């Protein structure tokens, strides 16, 4: 049997669109791609939204999403959708990790640290709100939130909208037995960057 090599080439950021304005791929000199599309069989597939396991078709794809989906052969929930499903069916609260968190925080303070936005790439604020609500249901008395502002997967000036949403939610839960507040904050560019300068990282961690 004759066999031929197959090469899987991943080109992040390359997409198919007839739009001219802002279309770097269409404007570029791409002789190899042009040849392949003119002489070989090909098809366009979606790399965003529900086709790759994200919550909705409004959610853009990115390198992490694409790399997780390549070669699966079927749609798997990933990222924010996976977390959202586990919250909706309650399985996250049955996990050993959650049970241990709640047990350790009884009589103490439970801290939440994470990205505060609904960008759905790395987080969704609805998950945090749900966990704060569940923490109260399970008898915890004190919650402190350390917010990392986004500005990348959502508009750069949208941070206060998420702060208000969080504060309104906590205010609706706070009473004589429950106290939830924002304790500190920071920016994702300082605390979530892959290879930050040591001075930047140390200063940001101390702040939070």
Walk through the language-model features, giving the residues of each:
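Conserved anion/nucleotide-ligand pocket segment
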Residues: 197-200, 205
